[in-house]
Amino acid sequence: MRIHAFAALLLTLPAAAQGAPAPNLLQEQAQRFQPIPSSGGIVAAQEARAAAVGAAVLRRGGNAVDAAVASAFALAVTLPQAGNLGGGGFLVLWLPRSGRISTCPAAARAASPPESIAIGRGEAVALNFRETAPQAAGPDLFLNPDGSVNRERALRSPMSTAVPGSVAGLLQVQERYGCLPLATVMAPAIALAEQGFPVGAELSASLAAAAPLLKADPTSARQFFKADGRPYRPGELLRQPQLAASLRCIAREGAGCFYRGRVAQALVRLMRQRGGLITAADLAAYRAPWMTPLSAPFRGHRVLTMPPPSGGGATLLQLLQVLEPLDLEATGLNSAATLHPMVEAMNLAYRDRNRLLGDPAQVVMPLERLLSGSYAAQQRQRISADRHRPAAELEAEPSRLSEGTNTTHLSVADRDGGLVALTTTLNTAYGTGSSVPGAGFLLNNEMDDFTAKPGAPNAYGLRQGQQNAIAPGRRPLSSMTPTLVFRGDGTPLLATGSPGGSRIITTVLQVLLNRLVHGLNLASAVAEPRIHSQLWPDQISIEQGLSPDTLRLLQQRGHRVLLTPAMGSANSVEVLPEGRGSLGVADPRRLGAAAVVELPWP
């Protein structure tokens, strides 16, 4: 069968829904948003060209893994504020054991990782390619002599850069589960960097806003601005020849180029010149471990998500278990009676996240207890039906368990129902702002995700504990939450995730609640207004779109309400039952996001 790919920005189009029952006004209004259908595979990503790259790889006979890796490398070119070679991330995947494309001779050349688990007619596994602290890093790295945290050093200095994991992770998953040669998968990203692409309105505005940060570094200034120092305007061509050379080297030599070869040498040279901590030994020692996904039932479905050092997956499952018995359908979508217990559960869950979670390779965590039904019941009992419990009140309680902006997410479904949820990050937008001379990629500032000082907020306002202290080789706690959902019979339903720092977890939570509890279609589930609360600061961040009455009722319960700009970018895909194709949604909150579909040729 001949197939072709076409790209289309996800538009929030009104749906007539003729003859369809409308259970209530809110749900009827929400269903105006419709996902993009595909009779084949689909890719939803934060940038349209990168999504189109993934769809083109599906057309070439690639599976969901091939498409996800191709899109991720393309994002390193077209979305430099978040896509990267110099950062890290997580992914969760599921592939069927048999099918037209999801399995192939290339993918069968190695045994399944022992960490994989059987789900339905396939297997699922997670990959941890989070950055690691250099061996020279210690717990006092970002402290001033008076004990205060040096925020500039934690966010912008070479010491804020952790050992990157993106290249190792993407190559490892493609080698194990992909069907196409690496050179084929990486070719589109190389072409985008070498030949250039027209800058869109979002990237043009982003680069202009980041000009003070990027122009402080000579290499970044040359890479992202014109010769006269002006930012690129929409429609102007941005070429990145140094990045193209690095991508070409990786495609030819594999991970060795980045961790031991030409790129490694350039990175270590920069570290020595500027007082950074990463050494050649740190790079050569980097590994991306396979992990068993966290799993829990929810409303007749099974949710699979990322284990620590993602703090997102465990926090998400804890929230789902606390909220599952509540009759949220009866209280209604986005009502104060629904949002209040959600906020209180968020605060309790973030309290546990910040105190208890860390890198499982170095700290002991009470995960089994944290995710148990009995603990969820205890947490529910602590939620008052009509009163907000202030953060200071919760923080003063002893723990019931013992301690032991910019990111990007893409989701892919292939024709066999194979799913990949992949999230990568530099931490804040453009990371440190510094690029590696001769290599063309930005450095992350992930060391700020560690606890610089217990109780001191990081860039996202999270007050974390000793479990997440800086230590050599340790991976910082993250909020990235790539997530898959399966129907009760084990067939795949959807893949989702989001950027957004500490707001990632609550974004994914609300997409799942909107889809699985309130019955919205995937586009409506993604488009609905979002809320966020994380214990500190003691407030609810709320997007525009909730009714004034809802805000007033929340305030009457004791909540401090803060209207905030759009949160997250939950690019998601859904697999239709019985091989009927897939659906894709690019979050309308981010200009330039796209769902790109694969269809049979007419």
Write out the residue ranges for each language-model feature:
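Bacterial N-terminal signal peptides
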Residues: 4-15
